């Protein structure tokens, strides 16, 4: 694992990579748990860094389509010699159907095909038919995106009022990665109390970062807006009851 910094939105940079001897790099933009995205120029710098050193670059672009104030860039804008992973799970809301795709450099297609066939033959026929149909659901999918956007705005407006002042830039996806160091040094204990007492489910940062994750929690806003508003009120009550909020 490459240690990233809050300064760079928890995304790797060539400077970060220079400290490691690596043969491959996996990036995610938008990412989970932060929701942050790599800007176009830094992404190009990563592509060039890897190309110059013959480092295989794998770009997880599964959350493409779910973004707010900035447009995502793909590594294919800068090179054909990268691997791109994508899926119907997130933007197309087909998580349980287990279907996606990968873009591979032409000379590696057969290699990747053999690896894939050793794990499974193909996605189920039903999943493939539904995936084709998903392309016709643009209106519904954009409505989902508007719901995420509204939920995001409600949370970004409310959470600082409860003392959550340090949140990773939620450029895309549907997560907030929140610093709780002012309240706790044990993210698991914090989210357990939030669930048991407040009735709101969050994810402890240690699930994503065993070194620095005890000061972070992840919150998902991929629900209906009334549910998010209900959750905001519950968080407020919890923070007051636990004396975190005066």
Q: Where does each model-flagged region fall?
A:
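Structural signature of PLP-dependent enzymes
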Residues: 112-119, 134-157
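Conserved glycine-rich beta-strand-loop-beta hairpin in the small C-terminal domain of fold type I
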Residues: 132, 148-159, 167-180
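PLP-dependent enzyme catalytic core of the Aspartate aminotransferase-like
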Residues: 193-202, 208-246
